[in-house]
Amino acid sequence: MQILKDQENLNPDGGSFVLITPPLSPPKQKSLSYTNISRRHGMRACMKGIVYEVYKNQPKLWLQQELIWLRRKRIHPIPKARRNNHVGRWANRHSNVSSSSGSRGRSSVSSRDSSPSYSGALRSAERSISSSPSTIEARRRKSARGNGLNGAIDVANLPFEELPNFCPDMSVLDNRTHPRTLKAEWKGPPLDLSDDPYRDLLHPAELHLASTLRLPCLIYLDNKKRIFAEWHHRRQQGLTFRKTDAQRASRVDVNKASRLWKAFHEVGFFDD
């Protein structure tokens, strides 16, 4: 209770009086009101969520109530910065776990490899596998398929002067009864080879083919020589000469190498 003395107001007898007032009470906390929420009545049971409507009518009170509930449950809200980095943190944790597991796996493998018994057994197994006749024969077949020359000559990297000449005689194209000639299709206008200094080394059908593929005469002669050298050596190995083999042996675009292979193949130059 508070006791207040009023010195100015005097009673009729001339004496002062004492004013006694009740204590000040703190303001009561407002509670969320659900009276303004519309309800549906009907003959059947119906449930409707009103959380958003209550929040929309009294957002501040709703937030206070939620914070009180979180404090009671000892649940701390996640700050905004932590929410933004939540996915990245889980990704980093996953990468750390995978890297640690990988390092543990590597350490276990390295420790196992460092043991004398394991390393000795591994070396002996490798020697037995590498020295087996089937493995050696498989390696020979693979190398023969890879470059077509059993590792003896690398057609694609040899200079033009050192390449053996296995090109066929182009005079067979002069035969009027020959059903096919060198033909190819290419986008763009043909290349003018009228002033090429090496045009005399080409057959007229070859000039037409080189012009269509936009290849100068010297580049055409170089790639023709490489293609037929690769074909000859693959035939010696008993292997077929495919379009991809011509692409590996050539020094031009793979599409142009494919057109050259197709033109020579259709004429029958690759027939055994």
Curated annotation (Swiss-Prot):
Predominant place of localization: nucleus
Record region (Disordered): 86-148
Modified positions (Phosphothreonine) in chain numbering: T135
Residues found modified as Phosphoserine: S130, S132
GO molecular function list: chromatin binding; DNA binding; transcription coactivator activity
GO biological process: chromatin remodeling; regulation of transcription by RNA polymerase II; transcription initiation-coupled chromatin remodeling
Keywords, comma-separated and alphabetical: Chromatin regulator, Nucleus, Phosphoprotein, Repressor, Transcription, Transcription regulation
Tree of life domain: Eukaryota
GO CC, one annotated term: Rpd3L-Expanded complex
SS bonds (residue pairs): none
Biased composition (Low complexity): 95-120, 127-136
All residue ranges annotated as the SWIRM domain in the record: 182-272
Subcellular location(s) per record: Nucleus
Assembly and oligomerization: Component of the RPD3C(L) complex.
Function according to Swiss-Prot or TrEMBL: Component of the RPD3C(L) histone deacetylase complex (HDAC) responsible for the deacetylation of lysine residues on the N-terminal part of the core histones (H2A, H2B, H3 and H4). Histone deacetylation gives a tag for epigenetic repression and plays an important role in transcriptional regulation, cell cycle progression and developmental events.
Record protein name field: SWIRM domain-containing protein laf2
Organism: Schizosaccharomyces pombe (strain 972 / ATCC 24843)
Taxon lineage: Eukaryota, Fungi, Dikarya, Ascomycota, Taphrinomycotina
